[in-house]
């Protein structure tokens, strides 16, 4: 109770608060919760579609469980709303246990137009299934398939809230619509990553995807080309209906016509009802054209930015700048973009113009002292001020993105004794949640520059 009084006295989220942050301690740890399963929690995500002044909801995943929490504004607490369990895969001959690694939120536009709950929670992990759960009913809305191995990262398209992209250990990237079981686009092949893909992200306009993984490479995939845009538009239009899973993922077999059959009575100008009936039968039996569009070649590739595994990559919101984290022996986050410095042109005269671009411009490197462990996802503040990254030994590191000269964390703290796996900001930027290998869910609140330092020291 005394702790709650101190929290309220800070008035961290009052409307009279300054928009500037308290530099020495930009965020304060206000709540910490241990999940009942007491297993490692690998992923967390705020509902990015919640209003700024609405109570924020955050999902966490670890083991076979998905937990849903609310983050009240005026109380320093993390309140459990509900949870669900995905224990085993009974569809296979050998039962395998699910272990969830990543989670995101989607907004189903068809449900919204029909005055039904549009919020969906999407998660995946070891079994390669993508589960779409209705936030209100808590029931499984859809199960997306086609991924061949573990799912390591799922991200929602900022420009189309029905689309997700996932990174898989099967060395492929897939784009799904949450209302269709089969994927719409598969990215892979000889020009793709040569190992497990650990992380992906969309550009703000949805035209590009970044990817990274075990092979140290950074890749950019162009979705703005006409063929890809038209394919996605057709698919989204077909799926904008009450029925789900209407598109099939089969071999793109040409539509059967009389021209593709043996020389028939048509060429002899003699009616042949039997052949016409056979033609109709072929049309019924042969699947419709596939909803799957393959992409084999990235638009840009970097092979020398990182020297070890790259386990997290993110676009800086609203820009074409990127942040990527190396682990193992590297332990650093790089701030960069594809393309030459401003005013310069990439020289490709002696190269194959059909090959991906390889030029990059690096602006800054941030050291991550306790970042040797892999599968740690950082988060970028929606206000583009702070980058927060977890590390081994429960460490949490805050980097000031406005201070280009600083290479080390501006502020560090500890939330436990084991690795912090992921950080997630609320859309308003006032709340931060982190999850750990110990099973802790940790809440941080943003500290305004106008907060009395004496009051903050008491908390």
From Swiss-Prot:
Keyword Nucleus among UniProt keywords: yes
Coiled-coil region list: none
Pfam family, one: WD40
Keyword Nucleus set for record: yes
Disruption phenotype: Double RNAi-mediated knockdown together with mes-2 RNAi results in ectopic expression of the homeobox protein egl-5 in the head region. This ectopic expression of egl-5 in the head region is enhanced in a nfya-1 bp4 mutant background. In addition in this background in males, there is ectopic expression of egl-5 in the mid-body region including in seam cells and hypodermal nuclei, and there is ectopic ray formation.
Tissue expression as described in the entry: In adults, it is predominantly expressed in the germline, and weakly expressed in intestinal cells.
InterPro entries for this protein: PcG_WD-repeat, WD40/YVTN_repeat-like_dom_sf, WD40_repeat_dom_sf, WD40_rpt
GO BP annotations listed: heterochromatin formation; negative regulation of gene expression; negative regulation of transcription by RNA polymerase II; regulation of gene expression
WD repeats: 146-186, 192-231, 305-346, 370-409, 415-454
One Gene Ontology cellular component annotation held by this UniProt entry: PcG protein complex
Keyword set, alphabetical order: Developmental protein, Nucleus, Repeat, Repressor, Transcription, Transcription regulation, WD repeat
Subcellular location: Nucleus
Family membership noted in the UniProt record: Belongs to the WD repeat ESC family.
Oligomeric and partner information: Interacts directly with the N-terminal domain of mes-2. Forms a heterotrimeric complex with mes-2 and mes-3. Does not interact with mes-4.
Cited function: Polycomb group (PcG) protein. PcG proteins act by forming multiprotein complexes, which are required to maintain the transcriptionally repressive state of homeotic genes throughout development. In association with the nfya-1-NF-Y complex, may play a role in repressing the expression of the homeobox protein egl-5 in tissues such as the head. PcG proteins are not required to initiate repression, but to maintain it during later stages of development. The mes-2/mes-3/mes-6 complex may participate in the global inactivation of the X chromosomes in germline cells.
Name used for this protein in its record: Polycomb protein mes-6
């Amino acid at each position: 109770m005394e702790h709650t009084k101190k929290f309220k006295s800070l008035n961290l989220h009052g409307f009279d608060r300054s928009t500037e942050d308290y530099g020495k301690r930009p965020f304060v740890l206000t709540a910490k919760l241990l999940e009942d399963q007491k297993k490692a929690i690998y992923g967390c995500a705020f509902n990015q579609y919640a209003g700024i002044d609405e109570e924020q909801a955050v999902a966490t995943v670890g083991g076979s469980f998905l937990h849903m929490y609310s983050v009240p504004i005026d109380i320093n607490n993390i309140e459990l709303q509900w949870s669900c369990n995905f224990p085993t895969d009974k569809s296979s001959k050998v039962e395998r246990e699910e272990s969830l690694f990543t989670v995101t939120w989607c907004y189903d536009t068809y449900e919204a137009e029909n005055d039904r709950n549009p919020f969906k929670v999407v998660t995946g992990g070891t079994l390669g299934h993508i589960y779409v759960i209705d936030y209100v009913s808590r029931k499984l809305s859809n199960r997306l398939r086609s991924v061949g191995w573990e799912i390591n990262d799922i991200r929602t398209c900022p420009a189309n809230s029905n689309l997700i992209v996932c990174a898989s250990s099967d060395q492929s990237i897939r784009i799904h619509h949450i209302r269709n079981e089969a994927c719409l686009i598969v990215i892979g092949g000889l020009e793709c990553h040569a190992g497990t893909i650990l992380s992906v992200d969309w550009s703000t306009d949805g035209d590009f995807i970044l990817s990274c993984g075990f092979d140290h490479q950074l890749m950019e995939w162009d979705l703005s080309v006409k063929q890809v845009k038209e394919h996605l538009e057709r698919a989204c239009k077909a799926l904008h209906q009450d029925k789900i899973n209407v598109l099939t993922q089969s071999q793109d077999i040409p539509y059967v016509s009389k021209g593709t059959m043996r020389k028939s009575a048509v060429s002899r100008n003699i009616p042949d009802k039997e052949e016409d009936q056979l033609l109709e039968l072929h049309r019924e039996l042969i699947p419709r054209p596939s909803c799957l569009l393959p992409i084999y070649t990235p638009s840009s590739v970097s092979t020398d930015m990182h020297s070890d595994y790259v386990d997290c990559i993110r676009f800086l919101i609203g820009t074409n700048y990127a942040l990527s984290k190396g682990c193992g022996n590297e332990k650093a986050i790089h701030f960069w973009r594809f393309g030459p410095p401003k005013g310069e042109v990439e020289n490709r005269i002696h190269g194959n113009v059909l090959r991906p671009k390889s030029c990059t411009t690096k602006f800054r490197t941030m050291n991550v002292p306790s970042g040797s462990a892999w599968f740690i996802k950082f988060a970028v503040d929606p206000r583009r001020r702070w980058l927060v990254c977890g590390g081994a030994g429960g460490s949490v590191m805050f980097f000031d993105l406005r201070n280009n000269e600083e290479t080390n964390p501006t502020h560090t703290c500890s939330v436990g004794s084991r690795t912090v796996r992921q950080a997630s900001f609320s859309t308003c930027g006032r709340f931060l949640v982190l999850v750990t290998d110990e099973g802790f869910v940790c809440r941080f609140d943003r500290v305004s520059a106008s907060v009395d330092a004496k009051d903050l020291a008491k908390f």
